Amino acid sequence: MSIESVTRLVRTLRRNLAEITRSLYKDSDYCIKPGYRSRVENEHHDDTGFRDEWQREVYVYAAELMQRERLASVIDIGCGSGFKLVSLLGEFETIGVEVPPAYDLLRSTYPERTWFHWTEMPKPGVCADLVMASDVIEHFPDPGDLIAMIQAIPSRYVILSTPERDLIRGKSDFGPPENQAHCREWNSDEFRRYASLHFDVIDHTITNREQGTQLVLCRPR
């Protein structure tokens, strides 16, 4: 078989696999409008080079919640470089969850803090007053995987943030997302409905209109 034939075969197999995967992960299951097309093969997003350029307001919101409700501990799933977690929530007991290369960087940069590899969670006996995932859910082919992890961690509050599709793409956008690392994006109504399937939503707000960041504050059921 020639190289050209092998290349065509690989492309066909990848295309067929993408269609099969898309049929398994129906966007209607995630409360997204009919006709929307998600991305089934997304790029890994390495944000170890970022500090607080994105989603800073989410961490400020979390800090204010913890102070107001006198919470003591937080688990940050997909904490990236850890800068926002340590700088804005450093007065509390923190646990960060990541994958390499971020996981290795976190352990070497902040050895005094607690870091878990994604595959370690949920970890028996590990709990927190607040579990948060800041702009993480849009990276999952099946966001139910993230939801299941959060639900398995005993907590009092949950914070989820994600891009507000209509703000950053316009109401006529039907995907896939422009960001190659995103599988799908929700508008405000869709995200609130999806979060409400799994948690009791007690607040839903736009934390940064320019960046199009929306946030839901929830209580576990």
Where are these regions (language model features)?
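Conserved N-terminal segment of class I S-adenosyl-L-methionine
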Residues: M1-C127, S134, G144-M149, I153, ...
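A short His-aromatic
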Residues: D135-H139
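Alpha/beta-hydrolase-fold catalytic nucleophile elbow
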Residues: S161
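A short acidic, helix-capping loop that chelates divalent metal ions and anchors anionic groups
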Residues: I168-K171
